[in-house]
Amino acid sequence: MIITLKQNAAAEEVSRLRGELEAQGFVIHPVEGTRYNILGLIGDTASLDARQIESLDFVDKVTRIQEPYKKANRKFHPDDSVINVGGVLIGGGHFAVMAGPCSVETPEQVIETAKACKEAGATILRGGAFKPRTSPYSFQGMGPEGLELLELAKKETGLPIVSEVMDISQLQYFDNVDMLQIGARNMQNFTLLKEVGKLNKPVLLKRGLSATYEEWLMAAEYIMSEGNEQVVLCERGIRTFETKTRNTLDVTAIPMMHELSHLPIIMDPSHAAGMSRMVRPLSLASVGGGADGLMIEVHNDPSKALCDGPQALRPDQFTSLMKEVIALRQALVECTK
């Protein structure tokens, strides 16, 4: 339930109402918006008389939320959330580009790639140290040593880093990682979601291969319900009947998520197509669709990559793409003036 307050609502009256509702066992989530302030109620509100609350002089209206996700709901939080990742803002008009190798392999590889990404305009360095692979015989990542190399690249470039955590036991190694990534396969690993929800660290939540929008937002709700509301959604392609591409990038998710939720949404065109030649058009489509950022795989030598080389861009290709992304972003801003 959402209680929308009038602009002239007295603090004493609002505090009294909050106290009465909390005494009944409800968790109150106050939100101060640019247009109005609200009190979000979490709990079983079936017994509450909405008309009685609405009759209070300082209450504008009462709205019951039908969707199962509350904290991730746009109705619960009308203004766009802005997430701070090591000084880089995402959402609310702030656009971020996460770029780097699928997996960390050598000091030279990650540092060379990181420097090239920063020079081209990337704002966050991505890199995998723990890799969830379809085959148990494939390269599984360097583990803690890979995270140390990412930290080294961070010191060299100043770029904050995002890396995937696959299991609760791995969290002990992520103290110096600026943003935790929950991969598509772990989107409904509820134990892991709850654990990262207890941390004061931004989380990048990738959509599951066959997840609906509601299932995706409910996964975000698991994180937020534990206290961590620093969540960024990432669409990375879903499984459809099409076989020409690895996955199908759901561009519709951008406006739909902006309508349903206040959380930022970024797009991962690299994993969606699985082919480097598709990254450019899918990236531009994502920018045009209103995405809050991009996540792009870049490798200094894709032909020698130990993981997903065919979908990685070379530094020169990424540089060319970033010029187009920046130009398109500027054009869109001009169109809205």
Language model features by range: what are they?
Residues L199-V298:
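Catalytic alpha/beta core domains of metabolic enzymes, predominantly
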Residues F95-E112, P136-Q140, P160-E164, G183-R185, ...:
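Active-site mouth loops of central-metabolism enzymes
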Residues R126-P144, N300-P310:
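Glycine-rich, proline-tolerant flexible connector loops at the mouths of alpha/beta enzymes
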Residues K6, M142, G158-S169, D178-T191, ...:
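Catalytic beta/alpha-barrel core
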Residues R74-D79, S135-E148, S169, A184-N200, ...:
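Active-site-adjacent beta->alpha loops and helix N-cap segments on the catalytic face
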Residues M1-V97:
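Non-catalytic terminal accessory/regulatory regions of metabolic enzymes
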Residues F139-S163, E195-P202, V251-I265, Q311-E334:
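Alpha-helix-loop-beta-strand connector modules within alpha/beta enzyme cores
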Residues A96-P101, L125-G127, I161-S163, L180-I182, ...:
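Hydrophobic faces of well-ordered beta-strands that scaffold small-molecule active sites
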